[in-house]
Curated annotation (Swiss-Prot):
Protein name: Tubulin alpha-1C chain
Required cofactor names: Mg(2+)
Residue positions where Phosphotyrosine is found in the record: 432
Subcellular location: Cytoplasm, Cytoskeleton
Sites of Phosphoserine modification: 439
UniProt-recorded Gene Ontology molecular function terms: GTP binding; hydrolase activity; metal ion binding; structural constituent of cytoskeleton
Modified residues (3'-nitrotyrosine): 282, 449
Enzyme class: hydrolase
Biological processes, Gene Ontology terms: microtubule cytoskeleton organization; mitotic cell cycle
Length: 449
């Protein structure tokens, strides 16, 4: 089997974890107590879901997941919530005092007290796997635990499980709204530390998701639950190929092979369609062509940036539901002719496609309409450098005045780490710039496509 272990770090990671496991349980017909009623077993003997769940002798299905937070309140909600019986108590690990939005606390002082316990738990999960494929790490960039503890964990996972792939789902600080003043510091420190340990990082920015909820789902004031449910649909689409059997199946390592041209350039942009409320879905057809086209609308992306200003290096389309290859090929052909999609000149227009016959599941009482088919597009585009540039600019404004730096130094960091991290980010921006630059000396013949 190709098992995956999910690790949810900090408040954002844990709350997205709740939404994801809720959805997985619905998709696989697993009840909140971990039982799978025999009449619900889809198609009988389909055990692909064992990549995400392990089965006990008593027929209970336990998620292969660890929830970690340096303070107890968020995970206490899991301990008392609907799914309290789903998780093994030792999978929910909490500390006593939080990281206070401080990378240094998550990475050095508070984080190191709990790291061995976490690794021990992960080791137990890994030992239950026959062929561990890799780790999915969920966290935010802005928080102290999400940034500091995650980067510590990634370093240690690289040591313990060197060759296993590590994928991140990261909540990137939104351009306009912020939950902490020091987000730019934490984000840049964590990106710098994690860059060499992560194989692929799917970024999601809250503001982009807010806008999608407002615009497509007509939710006037989206809550984190609304956001997380939408994020969980995307995560579910990305992992569906590991959990169900399909026509064109894609596994974790296959993503990286197709999406990551250079080790450092591993930040694909996720786009999901159709995001539509039940009232609207009733009046629309949502053909394969339509949803494929929607993926190339900047409005449907999970990070605010404009791919029309950048170039694509790779593109993965993951369909699920009632989709046949003929429709997909037609849709892609149309897009190639109509859209102004620029690929870098060293990469011929390659679209990788995955198809899963399991239609998207919706959470009862959720915001999304039940649809026949959906698509999640993962594209590696140079446009995401805009997001880095935005963050770097904010970092520079604060760091020029050395604002808030004493909190980090007080927890045992050195000021040199800031400048080192910032230089690494500058190098990353430069990498993106160079990848997008034409390999030929002439710049004028690039306009034809």
């Amino acid at each position: 089997m190709r098992e995956c272990i999910s690790i949810h770090v900090g408040q954002a990671g844990v709350q997205i974890g709740n939404a994801c496991w809720e959805l997985y349980c619905l998709e696989h017909g697993i009840q909140p107590d971990g039982q799978m009623p025999s009449d619900k077993t889809i198609g009988g003997g389909d055990d692909s879901f064992n990549t995400f769940f392990s089965e006990t002798g008593a027929g209970k299905h336990v998620p292969r997941a660890v929830f970690v937070d340096l303070e107890p309140t968020v995970i206490d909600e899991v301990r008392t919530g609907t799914y309290r019986q789903l998780f093994h108590p030792e999978q929910l690990i909490t500390g006593k005092e939080d990281a206070a939005n401080n990378y240094a606390r998550g990475h050095y002082t508070i984080g190191k007290e709990i790291i061995d316990l976490v690794l021990d738990r992960i080791r137990k999960l890994a030992d239950q796997c026959t062929g561990l494929q890799g780790f999915l790490v969920f966290h935010s960039f802005g928080g102290g635990t999400g940034s500091g503890f995650t980067s510590l964990l990634m370093e240690r996972l690289s040591v313990d499980y060197g060759k296993k792939s590590k994928l991140e789902f990261s909540i990137y600080p939104a351009p306009q709204v912020s939950t902490a003043v020091v987000e730019p510091y934490n984000s840049i420190l964590t990106t710098h530390t994690t860059l060499e340990h992560s194989d692929c990082a799917f970024m999601v920015d809250n503001e982009a998701i807010y806008d999608i909820c407002r615009r497509n789902l007509d939710i006037e004031r989206p809550t984190y639950t609304n956001l997380n449910r939408l994020i969980s649909q995307i995560v579910s689409s990305i992992t569906a190929s590991l959990r169900f059997d399909g026509a064109l199946n894609v596994d974790l390592t296959e993503f990286q092979t197709n999406l990551v041209p250079y080790p450092r350039i591993h930040f694909p942009l996720a786009t999901y369609a159709p995001v539509i409320s039940a009232e609207k879905a009733y009046h629309e057809q949502l053909t394969v062509a339509e949803i494929t086209n929607a993926c190339f609308e900047p409005a449907n992306q999970m990070v605010k940036c404009d791919p029309r200003h950048g170039k694509y290096m790779a593109c993965c389309l993951l369909y699920r539901g009632d989709v046949v290859p003929k429709d997909v090929n037609a849709a892609i052909a149309t897009i190639k002719t109509k859209r102004t999609i620029q690929f870098v000149d060293w990469c011929p227009t390659g679209f990788k496609v995955g198809i899963n016959y399991q239609p998207p599941t919706v959470v009862p009482g959720g915001d999304l309409a039940r649809v026949q088919r959906a698509v999640c597009m993962l594209s590696n585009t140079t446009a995401i450098a805009e997001a880095w540039a935005r963050l770097d600019h904010k970092f520079d404004l604060m760091y020029a005045k050395r604002a808030f730096v004493h909190w980090y130094v007080g927890e045992g960091m050195e000021e040199g780490e800031f400048s080192e991290a910032r230089e690494d980010m500058a190098a990353l921006e430069k990498d993106y710039e160079e990848v997008g630059a034409d390999s030929a000396e002439g710049d004028d013949e690039g306009e034809e496509y």
